[in-house]
Structures are given as C-alpha cells and as structure tokens.
Amino acid sequence: MKVKMLSRNPDNYVRETKLDIQRVPRNYDPTLHPFEVPREYVRALNATKLERVFAKPFLASLDGHRDGVNCLAKHPKSLASVLSGACDGEVKIWNLTKRKCIRTIQAHEGFVRGMCTRFCGTSFFTVGDDKTVKQWKMDGPGYGEEEEPLYTVLGKTVYTGIDHHWKDPVFATCGQQVDIWDEQRTSPVCSMNWGFDSISSVKFNPVETFLLGSCASDRNIVLYDMRQATPLKKVILEMRTNTICWNPMEAFNFTAANEDYNLYTFDMRALDTPVMVHMDHVSAVLDVDYSPTGKEFVSASFDKSIRIFPVDKSRSREVYHTKRMQHVMCVKWTSDSKYIMCGSDEMNIRLWKANASEKLGVLTSREKAANDYNQKLKEKFQYHPHVKRIARHRHLPKSIYSQIQEQRVMKEARRRKEMNRRKHSKPGSVPIVSERKKHVVAVVK
C-alpha cells in the first residue's frame, strides 16, 4: 500500500531564535483581500493623526546675547558649531550638542551686518557698521593670548553683507558696490556696481562658484560673473528684495525673499518669469536658506514666524512660532538637513526640527519600515478630504490668523475689481496677467 506523507520545510515557518517575529504565511491574491483599500485608508488617516499628535518641533533656545541676533553662519566642517552676530557688535560661537556658548568676541562697534566662514573651516569673516572687515580664527586664542583678529581691513563705506567663495581664498562684500577680495590683500581685486543704490546682500553660487548674486535697495536683483568682473543681468521687481539664496543642487535656481510678503524662485536663464511664487507670510520676508537636499527652503519673516516651503509648491508645508519669539531676522538649515536655526530680535537663537514629528535618535529596523510604510500611505491618500484637512491644520497666533483673513479679503477684492474692469472694457484691452508675471517689472541685460 502506498502512503503519501506530508512534508514541510521547517525553515519556512520556524523562528531561528525566540526573539524573532513569528513568520505568518500570506497569500497576496487580491480576491482574498476585498477590503484592502479601505484598510489602507484607515491606516493613512491614523498615521496622519499620529503625525500631528507627535509634532513637537521646538528643541532648544540658546540665550546669552544682550541685543537682537542679526546674522547666523554655519561651520562648513562641523555640525555642532554655529556662529551668531548681534546688533551690539558681539559674535558668539555655540556648541549645539551641549547647547552652550563656547566663545564670545566683541567684534565691531554697532551692528554685525554679516558673517561667513572660510570653506575649510579654519577662520571666519565679519563685517559691521564700523566700516571694517575682520578675519578671526575659528579656534580660540591660546593661554595668555588676547582675542584679536587675524587681520582687519578698514573700508571707505559701511559694508552690509559678506560671503565667501566655496573653493578659493576669495570673498565678496557689498555696500555701495560689490567688492571681490583676495584674502592676502588689503584692497579689493575688483569692484562691480550697476546703479547707485546700496546693496543689502551678496551670495556666491555653490555649484557654479564663479557666479554671484546681489540684491539692492532699488528693487534690483543683480547677477555677476567673477571671471569677467562685470554684471551679467538684473531683474527689477515691484518691491525690494532683502536677500537671496542659491539652490545647492540646481546651479541656475535661486530664491529671493521680498518685502511684498512673498518669495520668488527664479531660473537665472529666464528672469522675466519666476519659476514659482511662494505665498503664505503676512509680513516682509527677511531671510531664506535652502536645505542641503535642494528640495525645500526655510524663510524667516517680520510676522514672528518661520515657514518651510517645498521648492515646487506655492504654499508652505510647515509654520513654526512661539509666544516669546519676535521678528525673525535670520535663519539657517543645518548641513545634515535635520534641524533649523533662527535668530530673532528678542536676543534668542532657537533650534527646531526640520520634520516636526520626526523621532530623534537611532531607529530600529522595524521603526524605519513602519515610518516608510506610513509615509507611502500618506502620499497615496494625501488628496482625500479628511486626510488633507488633518495634515494641513495648524494653530496660529491671533495676529497672524487675522492678517491672513485680511489678506484673503483684499486679494478677493482685487480679483473682483479686475473682473469688473475686464467685463466693462473693450475685449482684449485688459489682458489676463498670471500671478507669476505680475511682480516682475523688467529684465535688463
């Protein structure tokens, strides 16, 4: 008689150790799982709710300045070090790990208008209202030595900004004009200007390092080529631009922080139309900085908040504020893309998480898998009304909330007025102008 025996491979169902997870046989035939999509929807809804529950972005407040914080600079080689300059001429170097000030320098008389670090991280530069450019050692003075700059350059006019080249021992300052300096010389290698108004900010391109951009008080954004020592072209906007920041991953793109409450992302090859207009702030935007990934940027505003924008979206994905935080003057995104620092005029530097609900520290493999799965579910169901409503909801201060409502009413009134004018005018006499083209006055080459 023939007997058929059942044989199973124990490797398919037996755990190697008792600490392993039990292996569960699964059949992925969709006919056996008729409620797969409703189950995923519930999981996406729960994941979105939990994201808002665990959204605790504020990490620390670094206090020690005796006047408002006017500028920040990152250390190019160390994630733990950050430099800050105040309105009383004081520069502090902070250790973010210990959340303590490790060094204080009385650098200038009056405001510290700008500061930048050398690309190798051995020294940093500051400019102030006392018409001087100073270079300082990143490491403190030795025992018995006095705190003195490596060298000092006395200029003829007040310098309002400074930035260092990403590869060469060259830096640029701005004021009445844009000056290019060699570190070994006490006079500018070349000077460039276009117009007669003062220039408030200058920034080197991190990819095409010979390019730099500046913004002037006559509403211009001017681009320069350091090889030709001449301006390339400029774009004139309706209102003044406070600062610009280049995208670290896309060589031709930069974002401008404007006085008209908006930010504009431009492609320098086609300046007549912005790539994107970023709208959400309710007061002048004072500073902007990109994440190292180039996918997002953070903006600081006079409305006492900071916002995180995706590069390709016109609305912010996150807004950070506290009860004590006043006008935010400067903001930086750390080099590991995990944290954001902002300095405000009530003398504090605040440290935030870039992702408000992110768990800090080392994650287990199961936690990583669960996070990835939840993220995919939220992306899949992001346009469903309940998921979208929960994900977008933010608590705002009363001042910002009321200003948002006021701006909404004003925008609707302008739109209605334009429609009525078009309705009662000759066809074609009142053209339809897109939001992106409204704010650009002219491009000059």
Swiss-Prot record:
GO biological process: decidualization; epigenetic programming in the zygotic pronuclei; oocyte growth; proteasome-mediated ubiquitin-dependent protein catabolic process; protein ubiquitination; rRNA processing; spindle assembly involved in female meiosis
Involved pathway(s): Protein modification; protein ubiquitination
N6-acetyllysine found at: 49
Keywords noted in UniProt: Acetylation, Nucleus, Repeat, Ribonucleoprotein, Ribosome biogenesis, rRNA processing, Ubl conjugation pathway, WD repeat
A GO CC annotation given for this chain: cytosol
Region feature (Required for nucleolar location): 353-441
Tissue expression notes: Uniformly distributed in trophectoderm cells and inner cells mass in blastocyst embryos. Expressed in oocytes as early as the primordial follicle stage. Endometrial expression increases during decidualization and is highly expressed in decidua.
Record keyword Nucleotide-binding present: no
UniProt cross-references to InterPro entries, sorted A to Z: Sof1, WD40/YVTN_repeat-like_dom_sf, WD40_repeat_CS, WD40_repeat_dom_sf, WD40_rpt, WD_repeat_DCAF13/WDSOF1
Pfam families assigned to the protein according to its UniProt record, in alphabetical order: Sof1 (PF04158), WD40 (PF00400)
Positions of transmembrane segments: none
Function: Part of the small subunit (SSU) processome, first precursor of the small eukaryotic ribosomal subunit. During the assembly of the SSU processome in the nucleolus, many ribosome biogenesis factors, an RNA chaperone and ribosomal proteins associate with the nascent pre-rRNA and work in concert to generate RNA folding, modifications, rearrangements and cleavage as well as targeted degradation of pre-ribosomal RNA by the RNA exosome. Participates in the 18S rRNA processing in growing oocytes, being essential for oocyte nonsurrounded nucleolus (NSN) to surrounded nucleolus (SN) transition.
Family stated for the protein in its record: Belongs to the WD repeat DCAF13/WDSOF1 family.
Protein name, UniProt field: DDB1- and CUL4-associated factor 13
Organism (species): Mus musculus
Taxonomic placement: Eukaryota, Metazoa, Chordata, Craniata, Vertebrata
The encoding gene: Dcaf13
